UniProtKB/Swiss-Prot annotation:
Homodimer. Heterotetramer of two MnmE and two MnmG subunits. CDD domains: trmE, TrmE_N. It holds the Pfam family MMR_HSR1. It comes from Synechocystis sp. (strain ATCC 27184 / PCC 6803 / Kazusa). It is an enzyme of class 3 (hydrolase). Residues 221-377 form the TrmE-type G domain. Its cofactor is K(+). GO terms for molecular function: GTP binding; GTPase activity; metal ion binding. Belongs to the TRAFAC class TrmE-Era-EngA-EngB-Septin-like GTPase superfamily. TrmE GTPase family. GTP binds at residues 231-236, 250-256, 275-278. This is tRNA modification GTPase MnmE. The keyword Electron transport does not apply.
Amino acid sequence: MQLEDTIAAIATAIVPQQGSIGVVRLSGPQSLTIAKTLFDAPGNQTWESHRILYGHVRHPQTKAAIDEALLLLMLAPRSYTKEDVVEFQCHGGIMPVQQVLQLCLQQGARLAQPGEFSFRAFLNGRLDLTQAESISELVGAQSPQAAAIALAGLQGKLAQPIRDLRNTCLDILAEVEARIDFEDDLPPLDEDSIRQQLQNLYQQLEDILNTAQRGELLRTGLKVAIVGQPNVGKSSLLNAWSRTDRAIVTDLPGTTRDVVESQLVVEGIPIQVLDTAGIRETADQVEQIGVERSRKAAQQADLVLLTVDAHQGWTEADQLIYEQVKDRPLILVINKIDLGRADLVSYPPEITNTVLTAAAANLGIEALENAIIEQVNQTNLSPQNLDFAINQRQEAVLTEAQLALKQLQQTMAEQLPLDFWTIDLRLAINALGQVTGETVTESVLDRIFSRFCIGK
C-alpha cells in the first residue's frame, strides 16, 4: 500500500433503488483539495474541520451538477485515520455514489484497498490491532450481544489487560538483563517473587484464553441440525421456529431433498438452523443425495435435534438414525404431540434432554429454545457476562505467550543461566505484542485487513 496516496471508496452498502444515503470517503493529503474541486458550497460556509457543508457535487469541467449532497470535513489529526478525511454524503442508490467516486479518482485519488482506512488508522496510532479487529467484528455482528462484545474490544477492554501483561514481562526482563550486565553491582534476583509473578501471568492468560470459544459462538453462531425420518415434522419445526415458510411442508414423505438453512438469534446467540432431508433408505437418486447431506450436516452440527413422531412412537428407523448421531450433543424433539401421546414414546434411557412440540400448531417452541440455551450452558460456552472475547488469531498468539511463560518456569526450575530466561521472556513479550500489533508482521497485517470491506 502507498500510504502517501489519497484514497477513496464507497463507505456504505450499495443497494439498488433502496439506500437513502450513500457515502464516498476520502483520506490522505489531497482530500481537501479534491473536495474543493468537486463540491460547490454556496454562501459563506466555512471550510473548517468537523463542519458539514451543504451544496452540490459538480463536474470540474462542465460544472454540471452530479448530486445534491452534504460534505463532512474531518482534518488531521482529528479523524479516523489521523489524516485529512472528507466524506461526500450523497443520495443512495448506485449512480450518485459511483459518479462521485469516479470524479474523485479522476482528480488523483486511488481506489482504497480492503481495510485500508482502518490500516492507516492502525499505522498512525489511532487504533491498536485489537480495536481494528473489533471494527470488523462489529460490522459482522449477528446479534446484539456479539455487537456489544465487539464494541468492548473497540473501546480497549481487551488491549489494556494484554498491555499490562506485556509490561509485567518487560519489567521482569529488565531485572534479569540488569543482573546479566551488572552482576557485581546489584543484589540477587528475588526468584520467589518472579515465580509468583509468572504464576499470576499464566492464570491471567488462562482467563483470557477461556473467552475464545465463547466469543467464537457469538461470531459464528451455533449450528443446529434438525434430523429424523421423513414426515416427522422437521420442516414444520423449522417454519414454526423461524416464523417463516422457509421449508416446504406436505404430507408426502421425502418432500425435503436438500438442507434448508435459517438464521435465528436466541438469547443473544446466533443460531444457524439446518432442516435436513428425512433419513431413510431410498432408490430415488436425488433423495439419496439429500439423505447423505443430512448425515453430513448432523456430523458437522454443534447440536442435533433428533425429531420423532409422537403418533408413531419410537421406531426401528428412529433407532438407526439415533445410532448415527448419538455421539453429537443431542436434544430429542417429540413432535406432533397433538396427534399422539408423548409418554408412549419409548426412547433410549441415555437420552436425558427431551422437548415436546406440536410444530404445526406452534406449540413447544419456547421450551425448545430453553433446552438449547441450557445445553449451551452445560458446555461452558455460554457468552453471558463476557467483558470481551478473543478471536482465533489472538487465541493462537496468546497460547504461544502462555507456553513461553511455562517454559520459563521450567528454565528456572532447572537453574539454567539467566541468558536462557531472557529467551523465554522475549518469546512471551513478542507473542503478547502480536495481539495489540506492537510486534506483528506485515504478512499478518495484510491478512487481517484484507478481510475488511473496501470502505473501512
